Regions:
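Short, small-residue-biased leader/transition segments that mark boundaries at the very start
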Residues: 3-8
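Positively charged, phosphate-engaging catalytic surfaces used for nucleic-acid and nucleotide handling
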Residues: 12-210
Length: 210
């Protein structure tokens, strides 16, 4: 990491002074913000809120998204406590949870929404986010109670947590007659909100894929 920082510094120094100054000011500002966030974690939340608002998300959705971030953090903390390795093992368990509640792996889910490198959770509806949170929060709680030791036991725990949310999804769909999982991504969901505000579509959201 230190070597990378030195390379960045050398690259900046190689830029003519008058051209490098704006970039140096930007780096200083970013550094200041990170220090402030370390001192006051609430600033991280405030800045995340501001970023999502600028992207056109509703406050209701943003509240759920920020909560989802916290739920995910609690889950990964629990995985760390159980000796789960970051990277491949995290990805495997995440896929098990996703498959158990949505019927798809993370990659399949992203393909459905036409995503490549974009964050899947940033492209979920409020209900999708809530069910994903339920799956992850339940997995965390089951893990705390059962204290899995082996990776195989962690896989079973992930499947159990995901199944709880999967059952909830099926119950919701049975009551509404509408699939919870949608192919709409963030851009399409934002356009629906704009259309509703401008009166182009009915607030009830009659689109079969909504």
């Amino acid at each position: 990491r230190r070597q990378r920082q030195m390379c960045i510094r050398d690259s900046i120094q190689s830029i003519p002074s008058h051209k490098a100054e704006p970039f140096k000011r930007w780096l200083a500002e970013v550094g200041r913000e990170r220090i402030e966030e370390t001192i006051d974690p609430e600033l991280t939340i405030d800045r995340a809120l501001e970023t999502y608002l600028k992207k056109g998300y509703s406050r209701e959705w943003i509240n759920q998204r920020l909560q989802a971030i916290q739920v995910r953090k609690e889950l990964t903390d629990e995985w760390d406590a159980r000796g789960v390795q970051k990277g491949v093992e995290y990805a495997i368990l995440t896929d098990e949870i996703s498959r158990a509640w949505s019927g798809m792996t993370t990659r399949q889910y992203k393909t459905l929404k036409g995503l490549t490198k974009e964050n899947l959770r940033d492209n979920m509806t409020t209900l999708e986010l809530v069910l994903n949170m339920l799956a992850e929060a339940t997995t965390t709680e089951i893990s705390k109670q059962k204290e899995p030791v082996t990776f195989s036991e962690n896989i079973e725990t992930a499947r159990a947590g995901g199944k709880v949310a999967g059952d909830a999804r099926k119950a919701i769909e049975a009551q509404t007659g509408v699939p919870v999982i949608t192919s709409k991504n963030a851009a399409q969901l934002s356009q629906v909100v704009v259309d509703m505000i401008e009166g182009n579509v009915a607030p009830s959201g009659e689109d079969a894929d909504s």
